[in-house]
Structures are given as structure tokens and as C-alpha cells.
């Protein structure tokens, strides 16, 4: 299953990142930053339609979507079109994402950014904050209940939102 491959690839990547820059350092840096105040709940409760636009270079099913990838220009166009938030893929192996996209976009737009990755470790949340994210995606099917609760609390502590993805597998009778 592709999700299992994505999680394993992420696990290997995060372990390397933690060897390069330990959790303690990343956590301290993130906690020293100004708390954010973006709330997905507030955005989706507005009377007008809100939309999240996505910055994605590739996908496992389609491969590379665009060789030429002016992600900053795309983000500026999304903001100009009225996007409420921009989702930035940072998963490098299957989606060809990069944390530099998140960081550089955060310096060029004023709307909130969602780090879209397969968050499996608290390290990734602190790292998302450092790279300019206002929100992270938490996927229930790859996290246990205690991890999910802990990660939501970390987001709260950092002034970030947690967008929790849950799906129910249903088979008809």
C-alpha cells in the first residue's frame, strides 16, 4: 500500500534529520518564535466560501506534474485569487516536495500555510513552525490516539492549527 511506503520513507528521512539537527535544538528554536494565531475553525466558519490551494510538484499516481515549478509565483497567484490558505507539499520522495518551498513561500505571501506531509514525529511539527507553517496535517490512519493528542497539543503550544484527516472505510453490504 502506498501509504505504508510513504510512512516508511518519512520515518527514514526524519531519523536522518534528527541526527543532523537534534529535536532539542529544533524544539527550542520553534518555541522561541512568535506564536501564530491562525485558526482553521475560524476560516471555515466564515460566511464566504474558503478554499485551500495546493502547491504540489508531483504525486505518486501522476508522477511529475510540472518540471518548471515556479512555486513562489503560484503561491502569489493563489493569494491574489483569494485563497484562505496554501497547502505546501514537503514530502520529497513521492511528491517531490521540499521544506524550502514552505520557507520561501512564507516570505512571499501573507496568508497561512499548511505543511502537507506525513507527520509521524513531533520533530516535524516544530520543524514546520521554523519553516513558516501555520498548520500541519495530521492523518489519523498513521497516528495512534496518544500521538494525535500530543501533536495537537504541540500545535496549540506553538500557536499553529492541526488539520486532522480521518476517513472511514466503508464497504457496502
Language model features with spans:
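An N-cap/entry alpha-helix motif that binds or orients negatively charged groups
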Residues: 2-66
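Short, well-ordered coil/turn segments that N-cap beta-strands
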Residues: 47-51, 83-84, 109-112, 133-134, ...
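Active-site cofactor/substrate anionic-group-binding motifs, chiefly glycine-
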Residues: 57-86
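Catalytic beta/alpha-barrel core
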Residues: 86-94, 112-120, 135-145, 161-168
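Alpha-helix-loop-beta-strand connector modules within alpha/beta enzyme cores
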Residues: 98-114, 151-163
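Conserved small/polar residues in nucleotide/adenosyl-binding loops
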Residues: 170-173
Amino acid at each position: 500500500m502506498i501509504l505504508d511506503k510513504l510512512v516508511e520513507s518519512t520515518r527514514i528521512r526524519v531519523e536522518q534529520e534528527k541526527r543532523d539537527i537534534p529535536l532539542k535544538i529544533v524544539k527550542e528554536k520553534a518555541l522561541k518564535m512568535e506564536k501564530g494565531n491562525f485558526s482553521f475553525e475560524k476560516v471555515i466558519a466564515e460566511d464566504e466560501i474558503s478554499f485551500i490551494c495546493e502547491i504540489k510538484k508531483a504525486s505518486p499516481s501522476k508522477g511529475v506534474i510540472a518540471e518548471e515549478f515556479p512555486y513562489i509565483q503560484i503561491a502569489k497567484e493563489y493569494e491574489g485569487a483569494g485563497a484562505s490558505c496554501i497547502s505546501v507539499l514537503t514530502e520529497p520522495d513521492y511528491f517531490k516536495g521540499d521544506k524550502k518551498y514552505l520557507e520561501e513561500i512564507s516570505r512571499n505571501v501573507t496568508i497561512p500555510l499548511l505543511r502537507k506531509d506525513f507527520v509521524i514525529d513531533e520533530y516535524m511539527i516544530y520543524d514546520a513552525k521554523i519553516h513558516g507553517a501555520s498548520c500541519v496535517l495530521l492523518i489519523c490512519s498513521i497516528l495512534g490516539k496518544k500521538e494525535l493528542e500530543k501533536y495537537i497539543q504541540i500545535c496549540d503550544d506553538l500557536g499553529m492549527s492541526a488539520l486532522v484527516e480521518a476517513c472511514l472505510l466503508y464497504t457496502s453490504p
